[in-house]
Amino acid sequence: MLMTAEQYIESLRKLNTRVYMFGEKIENWVDHPMIRPSINCVAMTYELAQDPQYADLMTTKSNLIGKTINRFANLHQSTDDLRKKVKMQRLLGQKTASCFQRCVGMDAFNAVFSTTYEIDQKYGTNYHKNFTEYLKYIQENDLIVDGAMTDPKGDRGLAPSAQKDPDLFLRIVEKREDGIVVRGAKAHQTGSINSHEHIIMPTIAMTEADKDYAVSFACPSDADGLFMIYGRQSCDTRKMEEGADIDLGNKQFGGQEALVVFDNVFIPNDRIFLCQEYDFAGMMVERFAGYHRQSYGGCKVGVGDVVIGAAALAADYNGAQKASHVKDKLIEMTHLNETLYCCGIACSAEGYPTAAGNYQIDLLLANVCKQNITRFPYEIVRLAEDIAGGLMVTMPSEADFKSETVVGRDGETIGDFCNKFFAAAPTCTTEERMRVLRFLENICLGASAVGYRTESMHGAGSPQAQRIMIARQGNINAKKELAKAIAGIK
């Protein structure tokens, strides 16, 4: 049964998740002002699934349990499923202007499903059955799963087994008859605290020397020995200021990252999906990366829609909307944003079935998509800053605009002067101008810049990772033969 947004939030309260921030344990993390906006983002994935207007995008019928499920728990059954995934992600980006945190889990489901099938084919293991039963449980209960791939990595020039500290990549430290014990951490984990469960994957291709690091499994967020340390974001403590509203830029929604620590966590056999089969670590990584690079052609585009709208509003409020250079910049922003969407849709339309039966995206086009994502959002926010003007970063606080402290010769307050000197076109109030500029500050430089700027660079793999895959998938030799044929070279 599909949960409501309210039921999702209440379900988090029932977990015994250990969360630490600023060196202290956070007892009521669900209502903590720095965390709650990210929970609201996830809740939106539940809210829209309940809305008939969005049912076709947000929900689908499960091929495993035969019931209606949230699309975030779906195994893609067609290229239409892949396209709807991207459209759903764009919609949620438009509704939250933030990272809504469920994409990694969805992409992990599809990568692990197909990879475990092929592991079982080679080694006669039961990983595919383990995973299928696990996903049925997730679908039946409409749960959030954090997909966790990135290890801390330590010295990037060394393999996992060659690190000075062996825990810098998550690893198996003990094998038992009933399961395994793991130790290490997963870094930069988007939405991990807001998740009911975690599904762990290796972060790189591995050799036999690294076999203890070749592990994939699932565990609950409140597993014994698991805890999370909340990651900071630019301007994050603004959320803790009394009565904070306008200065936040995006009061209701936000992203979240954390370091997830596994301090000797036991994993039972039925929740293990890869255990020392090192030759399949690379396949799992590559498939997950492909799905996640496709995802960015949806979510970042939706956020981009809001950024473009905010820039256009700022131009209106500044009285500059008719300037030809402003119009041209908005056209360029739209061109860049829609190019990203084209990439997301293209790699979906060119998808194909895996041996396990679910659909995989076109890997080359997915990597082209993410390569563009590493660049275009930066240009979009640069143009937004250009249109907005310097007040975006020099504006006094909301408290100053509301201040009744008398400072003027004729009894004027601080608020009177702020509202007087920061008024703009008659089509808007000073507060409306403040609000749109604070939003742009937040998305360009503040807490939301984590999800729209730096995540666009490094999320789903840093730029060079895509270039390696583009080189691998680009089939240059075939292109040489085409050129030879046209040029008459034998």
UniProtKB/Swiss-Prot annotation:
Keywords recorded for this protein, A-Z: 4Fe-4S, FAD, Flavoprotein, Iron, Iron-sulfur, Isomerase, Lyase, Metal-binding, Multifunctional enzyme, Oxidoreductase
Record PANTHER family: 4-HYDROXYPHENYLACETATE 3-MONOOXYGENASE-RELATED (PTHR36117:SF3)
Name of the molecule in the record: 4-hydroxybutyryl-CoA dehydratase/vinylacetyl-CoA-Delta-isomerase
EC number assigned by the record: 4.2.1.120, 5.3.3.3
Stretches of the chain forming a coiled coil according to its record: none
Residues binding FAD, per UniProt: 149-156, 188-190, 325, 386-390
Needed co-factor(s): FAD; [4Fe-4S] cluster
Organism taxonomic ancestry: Bacteria, Bacillati, Bacillota, Clostridia, Eubacteriales
GO molecular function terms attached to this record: 4 iron, 4 sulfur cluster binding; 4-hydroxybutanoyl-CoA dehydratase activity; metal ion binding; oxidoreductase activity, acting on the CH-CH group of donors; vinylacetyl-CoA delta-isomerase activity
Comment on bound cofactor: Binds 1 FAD per subunit.
Gene name as annotated: abfD
Function summary: Catalyzes the reversible conversion of 4-hydroxybutyryl-CoA to crotonyl-CoA. The mechanism of the reaction seems to go through three steps: (1) the FAD-dependent oxidation of 4-hydroxybutyryl-CoA to 4-hydroxycrotonyl-CoA; (2) the hydroxyl group is substituted by a hydride derived from the now reduced FAD in an SN2' reaction leading to vinylacetyl-CoA; (3) isomerization to yield crotonyl-CoA.
